[in-house]
Structure formats: structure tokens, C-alpha cells
């Protein structure tokens, strides 16, 4: 059980930022703010959300993409991170699992996720 002051602080933190609704299997495009010395720039990272864990301020999600030379790159982001400039849902995937860790072992067409058609 959390202290009520900590709970009030966390609730205030959650109100400040809104995120689009997404789940595991969705393809996301994340804008990450990178600060280099005096300059700031936005770098985009596009991949499939393979896991969402935690709740409240401690909530995180993991995004996986296949980079250069077919090397898998996974990044874990705090849900309410200040470095996330933007989050876009590009495609909504249809999966039957909450954690898609099995995609790590798959290559090529086997790693595809069906898209939800509206």
C-alpha cells in the first residue's frame, strides 16, 4: 500500500501526459527527443510493441524492430517518459498473446503479425 502523498503525486504526474491507446502487436512510430550539448533533435523509432508491463507511473512498453543486417533491436520505454515527443499507432495488429517474446526467434515471414481490418 502506497502512502497517500505518493499516490497524489503519481496521479498528478499521470494527468500531465496523454498517450494513444495501443496494445501488444501494434506497430508504433515513436519520436524520441535526444539532447546533444545545446541542441535537441527528434529521432524516430518504428517497430512492433511486444510487451506492456506495470501500471501507473511505473508502466513500460517494449518495442522491437529489425535493424540493419537483420539485427533485432528492442527498446524499453517508460510510458510517461519526458523523452517521448510523440507516439503514433501506424497499424493495429491482431494477436492472441499479451507478451510477444516468441517473435525474437522468428525470421522473415514467420515474424509477421496480422493486421486488423476495419
UniProtKB/Swiss-Prot annotation:
Keywords: Ribonucleoprotein, Ribosomal protein. The keyword Ribonucleoprotein applies. One of its GO terms (biological process) is translation. One of its GO terms (molecular function) is structural constituent of ribosome. The keyword Ribonucleoprotein applies. Pfam families: Ribosomal_L19 (PF01245). InterPro entries: Ribosomal_bL19 (IPR001857), Ribosomal_bL19_CS (IPR018257), Ribosomal_bL19_sf (IPR038657), Translation_prot_SH3-like_sf (IPR008991). Coiled coil: none annotated. GO terms for cellular component: cytosolic large ribosomal subunit. PANTHER family: LARGE RIBOSOMAL SUBUNIT PROTEIN BL19M, RIBOSOMAL PROTEIN L19. This protein is located at the 30S-50S ribosomal subunit interface and may play a role in the structure and function of the aminoacyl-tRNA binding site. Belongs to the bacterial ribosomal protein bL19 family. This is Large ribosomal subunit protein bL19. It comes from Helicobacter pylori (strain ATCC 700392 / 26695) (Campylobacter pylori).
